Every structure is written in structure tokens, then in C-alpha cells.
Amino acid sequence: MESFRYHDLGRIAYADALEYQTAAFEVLLDAKATGKKEDNQLFFCEHLPVLTIGKSGKDSNLLIPEETLRERGVSFYHINRGGDITYHGPGQITGYPVFDLEYWNLGLKQYIHMLEETIIRFLSLYDLKGERLEGATGVWLDPEVPGRARKICAIGVKSSRFVTMHGFALNINTDLSYFSLINPCGFTDKGVTSLAMELGVPQDFELAKSQLRSIFMEIFA
């Protein structure tokens, strides 16, 4: 029996995806409060261009006026996850695990570590060495090499009574030029990258989703 139900929302506006995961989050919270049984849920999607900023984020990390964003067709949301500002858009796998961590006897720190491990294992399929950066979340390449550290996957979550929402954003074929609009995750001295950038050619997006889903099933068995 699978430990979660998987949903591929396809390419979707941020607000619409937020409705899906918020509804699942509230159902799981209610189930915990009333003793009902509800399934954990994993949502994968690909967003239309959007910037989101977490509850600890600084507006100064948005480098252009919000009006200019709108003119460029980029949405902007303040949301209740951890972390600072990041970009979501086409070519990026955005994942929203709505999980009851008590199902796996996990704390929040362990959960984030397992999310990072999921991405690290995925990258190893492409002979890339994903690593953690001390004091930061997410998955990086060359995190300790001055001038070379670059993030390939951002992570920001919310947890209430050990039920999670929000999640990760993994750059596959992402247009990285959008990251020039922000200080990604609040960093001014580190870069961003994508699977396509590292390998030199666009990657099979559907294959990447399938591979990532399989690794989720292994790690969150």
C-alpha cells in the first residue's frame, strides 16, 4: 500500500494550486482532530511565472517594482511558508507534499532532510552531486566552492500539528533569467542553476517527474 496519493496538476496558476493543497491540508488537519483516517497527498505541478515570498522574507529581495512584475506577466504572492523569495515557472517541478509527519514518526527537521535527500538521489541519476549548504535549506551544487555555489532546488514548508504544506521547487528546464528579478532565497552571493543548464541540453520533463515520484515512494515508504 502506498503511503501517499499522487496528483499531477500539470501547468497551473499558483493560486489554483494553492487551493488544492490548502484543501488537502485542512482535510488532513481535521482528520487528526477527529480521529478519522485520510490519505497523505503529493502534488506535482508546473506553474505559470510567479514569485512567492515566505513569512521570513524581505521585500527588499524583490529587485523591481511590483507594477513592473505585473507588466511582465509575473504574479507575486506573500505566503505562509518558511524561507524568503523564490521564482516558480514553466520547466520547474514544483512539489507540494501534504503529509502527516506522524505517519513516519518524523519531526520537521527530519522531514526537510528527507526532502533534500529525495532531490539528491534524483540528481545522482544524472551524475550530478547535489549537496546541502550549512545554515540553509534546499539542494546545491558546489556549495562550498567560492563563486561556484548554485542552488538547483529550493525548499520552503509550513507545518501545523505535524501536517505539512508547501514544499520544493526543482529546476529542470527553467528559464533562469527570472531569478535576476530577485535575490533568490535572500542570497546575494550565490547562483541558481537547472538540470538543463548543468547538462547542456533540455531534459525530458515528464521522465524527470516520473523519476522523482519513484524516489519519493522509496524514501517516504
Swiss-Prot record:
Classification via Pfam families: LplA-B_cat
One Gene Ontology biological process: protein modification process
One cellular component term from this protein's GO annotations in UniProt: cytoplasm
Binding sites annotated in the UniProt record for substrate: R81, G82, G83, D84, I85, T86, Y87, H88, A154, I155, G156, G167, F168, A169
Active-site annotation: C185 (acyl-thioester intermediate)
Keyword Transferase (UniProt): yes
Cross-referenced CDD domains: LipB
UniProt entry tagged with the keyword Acyltransferase: yes
Family: Belongs to the LipB family.
Note in the entry: In the reaction, the free carboxyl group of octanoic acid is attached via an amide linkage to the epsilon-amino group of a specific lysine residue of lipoyl domains of lipoate-dependent enzymes.
Function recorded in the entry: Catalyzes the transfer of endogenously produced octanoic acid from octanoyl-acyl-carrier-protein onto the lipoyl domains of lipoate-dependent enzymes. Lipoyl-ACP can also act as a substrate although octanoyl-ACP is likely to be the physiological substrate.
The protein's name in its UniProt record: Octanoyltransferase
